[in-house]
């Protein structure tokens, strides 16, 4: 079993924040791949299903971003999984909007959800970095990531989330390069 975690903040008021794009990604995966309904579990919401022939637990921590690692660690221990079985979907300031990159390990780049996850499970987990762009100056970062997507961004956002979900088979099978290239091809059209 793989554990795929979407990072975000719980609550309707945060639903369309750029910082919640990880939640949006796993919600779209659950819908496209017809996962079981979400249930309250592991200090968050979880849904199980299959992507290809791989069993996947989707997880949305309800602990708020800064404590996400508590939820991830609890799920990992319950299923007796290793850090390498965890994939975290998160917003990435250092990528252009709607670009998607995958890497394993690395630093947190100041992302509190990643920092918390690393503190609880180590840093050898896979990250699906979802580009939100940078507002230009570090003083504007907090307002930007905690701001809603604007109307002009909604179509590209939906296209990117759909591509992530549609190409998730590659991610589940461990072909990160193919996952990224197939998403790029879909978004180039």
From Swiss-Prot:
GO terms for biological process: protein quality control for misfolded or incompletely synthesized proteins; rescue of stalled ribosome. It is found in: Cytoplasm. Its EC number is 3.1.1.29. The record marks 91 as: Stabilizes the basic form of H active site to accept a proton. Keywords: Cytoplasm, Hydrolase, RNA-binding, tRNA-binding. InterPro entries: Pept_tRNA_hydro, Pept_tRNA_hydro_CS, Pept_tRNA_hydro_sf. The keyword DNA damage does not apply. TRNA binds at residues 14, 64, 66, 112. It is an enzyme of class 3 (hydrolase). GO terms for molecular function: peptidyl-tRNA hydrolase activity; tRNA binding. It holds the Pfam family Pept_tRNA_hydro. The active site is at residue 19. One of its GO terms (cellular component) is cytoplasm. It catalyses: an N-acyl-L-alpha-aminoacyl-tRNA + H2O = an N-acyl-L-amino acid + a tRNA + H(+). SUPFAM superfamilies: Peptidyl-tRNA hydrolase-like. The record marks 9 as: Discriminates between blocked and unblocked aminoacyl-tRNA. Belongs to the PTH family. Monomer. Hydrolyzes ribosome-free peptidyl-tRNAs (with 1 or more amino acids incorporated), which drop off the ribosome during protein synthesis, or as a result of ribosome stalling. Catalyzes the release of premature peptidyl moieties from peptidyl-tRNA molecules trapped in stalled 50S ribosomal subunits, and thus maintains levels of free tRNAs and 50S ribosomes. HAMAP family: Pept_tRNA_hydro_bact (MF_00083). NCBIfam families: pth (TIGR00447). This is Peptidyl-tRNA hydrolase. It comes from Rhizorhabdus wittichii (strain DSM 6014 / CCUG 31198 / JCM 15750 / NBRC 105917 / EY 4224 / RW1) (Sphingomonas wittichii).
